[in-house]
């Protein structure tokens, strides 16, 4: 969602804050702004749209100051425009904020009764006025922080700057991440280590409920009980270099093409092919005695969890339940004593998933996480962390993070199946050998660029698209539909192929695209019947199958993409690639913003 950066230095902080904002672009945003302290006054520039527009404002009216804050906003309260862009200012007070202040309406009414004039629709402006209210009454920075934290309900990361205190920033976090950076004669605060990496590698993470007073040469942290504490300082492994697109047109294109390599990296972390040995992290329980595993995730990661259910139940004979993170806490699910919960999140900061994790911990579950960012809140609050080696994923729509999640989940399933005595060494080798060959098959699919382009050209004018799959590839159909919606803004729905006759078939008419994910497996003949039904009603079928499946069809669709033959167990990883490619090329045809689709954010840090 929003991105925050703040800095105290002994030279102009504007270039460094701009660099930090650029590195936060991947989170998604619709406006940006910077405020600095200059000779005892606050100076601010804001712009709707991309950071390039903010840079244009800064060229016209430069900023200079040794203390400053910056922000990229993704609208929640108030439309995306300059007026609602952060930082928000009230007199000498400037505030940037990520999250949602749930009681902002009550606070707004109270502040208006005190004479404050509201200029925006945002909840953040309320915070700025609240800080000014306490500042005007002579409270010290420490007392101001205690007072506002007592008044605010909801989730937030806040950085506050007061002109009367040059060289000082105040910050607080509740269910939204903040990191502190230590530089040479400089201090930093930001949403994550990625934003701070160009300036410093020395990072300290605030824990939930922490608040802090930051000066150029000192830092004081208090916990949620207002007790002064220290938080460990570590050297971040995040690169300070700004990640580029290289030879690719978009980050998504680059990340799609990186999948053969990063899946290989992830496999090497969990499996040694020379000894046929699984290298999964040790857990504090016996997988053989585990009564149930609950998998919790959101968006694309939820579909990875659905596929993992097939693997864990089929291979390890382990009861698995898969929950949407935003629903998990609200249905009083049955979590047995000694059970475990696995939380999947690319960023490790998805707030729905984080809150679900805390709920599961309160219910006595062993906590495992599968993340791509090890310096993340979910990772720090887990008992065991499985790390995908996808590298930074910048495009909002997930590609390589998803397929590396699947690779890691299949490794976990094989490992636990072996520990639960349902797989012998020979069967482990068969599955893992097939998985190890997968990068070669993925590279083969990537070589067919021209036909994907041609198919996308024909489908780009569609109003609606249906995706169908069975068994392990039912979630692939769901993921394909999600990718198309995210990137091209075409309405798409994914269904289990066997459900077509139970409603979705009513949508079929002449020319409607139907994407069928149908490797030749035990379910193929039934899926082929669905294909015939779609063709009989004039549907434009796009078939994704292997040579054996294609040869068994009497009626050939207009578009047939022959996929490499793989073991059905690993097919969801392979078949993720064509649905990504189809969505990408259709988005190119439609001219949408592939890397930052409208209204979407990379890291969803509000509920």
Which positions does each model-derived feature cover?
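Conserved short alpha-helical segments that host acidic/polar catalytic motifs at enzyme active sites
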Residues: 1-245, 249, 258-291, 303, ...
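Generic C-terminus detector
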Residues: 540, 566-607
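Extended hydrophobic-aromatic, low-complexity segments
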Residues: 181, 304-305, 321-322, 351-354, ...
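Glycine-rich phosphate-binding loops that contact phosphosugars or nucleotide phosphates
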Residues: 288-437, 517-522, 526-561, 582
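Active-site phosphate/pyrophosphate-binding segments
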Residues: 259-263, 267-294, 384-513, 587-607
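Glycine-rich oxoanion-binding loops at beta->alpha junctions
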Residues: 49, 66-83, 269-285, 308-344, ...
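Acidic/histidine-rich
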Residues: 152-186, 460-486, 521, 528
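Glycine-rich, anion-gripping cofactor-binding loops and their flanking helix/strand elements
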Residues: 179-201, 326-361, 499-533, 566-580, ...
């Amino acid at each position: 969602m929003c991105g925050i950066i703040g800095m105290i230095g002994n030279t102009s902080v504007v270039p460094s804050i701009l660099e930090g904002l650029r590195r936060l672009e991947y989170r998604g945003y619709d406006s940006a702004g910077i405020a600095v302290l200059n000779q005892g006054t606050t100076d601010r520039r804001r712009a709707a749209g991309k950071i390039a527009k903010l840079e244009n404002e800064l060229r016209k009216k430069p900023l200079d100051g040794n203390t400053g804050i910056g922000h990229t906003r993704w609208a929640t309260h108030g439309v995306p425009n300059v007026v609602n862009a952060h930082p928000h200012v009230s007199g000498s007070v400037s505030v940037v904020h990520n999250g949602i202040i749930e009681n902002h309406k009550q606070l707004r009414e109270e502040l208006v009764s005190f004479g404050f004039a509201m200029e925006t629709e945002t909840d953040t402006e309320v915070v700025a006025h609240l800080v000014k209210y306490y500042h005007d009454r002579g409270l010290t920075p420490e007392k101001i922080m205690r007072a506002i934290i007592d008044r605010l309900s909801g989730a937030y990361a806040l950085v506050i700057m007061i002109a009367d205190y040059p060289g000082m920033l105040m910050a607080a976090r509740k269910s939204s991440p903040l990191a502190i950076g230590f530089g040479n004669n400089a201090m930093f605060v930001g949403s994550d280590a990625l934003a701070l990496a160009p300036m410093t590698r020395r990072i300290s993470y605030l824990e939930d409920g922490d608040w802090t007073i930051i000066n150029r040469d000192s830092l004081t942290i208090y916990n949620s009980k207002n007790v002064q504490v220290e938080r460990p300082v570590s050297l971040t492994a995040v690169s300070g270099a700004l990640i580029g697109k290289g030879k690719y047109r978009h980050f998504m294109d680059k990340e799609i093409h990186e999948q053969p390599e990063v899946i290989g990296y992830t496999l090497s972390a969990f499996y040694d092919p020379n000894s046929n040995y699984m290298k999964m992290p040790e857990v504090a329980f016996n997988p053989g005695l585990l009564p149930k595993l609950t998998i919790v995730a959101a968006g694309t990661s939820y579909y990875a969890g659905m596929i993992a259910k097939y693997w864990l139940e089929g291979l390890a004979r382990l009861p698995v339940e898969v929950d949407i993170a935003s629903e998990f806490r609200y249905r009083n699910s049955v979590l047995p004593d000694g059970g475990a919960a696995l939380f999947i999140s690319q960023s490790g900061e998805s707030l729905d998933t984080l809150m679900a994790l805390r709920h599961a911990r309160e219910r006595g579950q062993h906590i495992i996480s599968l993340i791509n960012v090890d310096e993340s809140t979910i990772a720090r609050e887990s008992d065991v962390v499985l790390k995908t080696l996808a590298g930074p994923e910048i495009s909002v729509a997930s590609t390589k993070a998803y397929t590396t999640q699947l690779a890691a989940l299949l490794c976990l399933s094989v490992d636990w199946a072996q520990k639960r005595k349902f797989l012998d060494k020979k069967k482990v080798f068969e599955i893992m050998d097939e998985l190890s060959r997968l990068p070669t098959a993925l590279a083969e699919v990537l070589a067919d660029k021209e036909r994907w382009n041609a198919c996308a050209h024909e489908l780009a004018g569609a109003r609606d698209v249906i995706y169908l799959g069975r068994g392990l590839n039912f979630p692939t159909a769901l993921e394909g539909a999600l990718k198309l919606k995210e990137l091209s803004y075409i309405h798409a729905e994914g269904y289990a192929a066997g459900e077509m006759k139970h409603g979705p078939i009513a949508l079929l008419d002449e020319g409607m695209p139907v994407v069928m994910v149908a490797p030749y497996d035990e379910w193929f003949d039934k899926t082929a019947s669905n294909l015939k039904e779609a063709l009989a009603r004039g549907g434009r079928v796009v078939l994704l199958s292997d040579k054996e499946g294609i040869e068994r069809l009497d009626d050939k669709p207009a578009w047939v993409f022959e996929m490499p033959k793989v073991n059905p167990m690993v097919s969801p990883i392979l078949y993720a690639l064509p649905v990504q490619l189809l969505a990408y090329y259709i988005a190119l045809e439609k001219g949408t913003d592939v890397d930052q689709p409208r209204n979407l954010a990379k890291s969803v840090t509000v509920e």
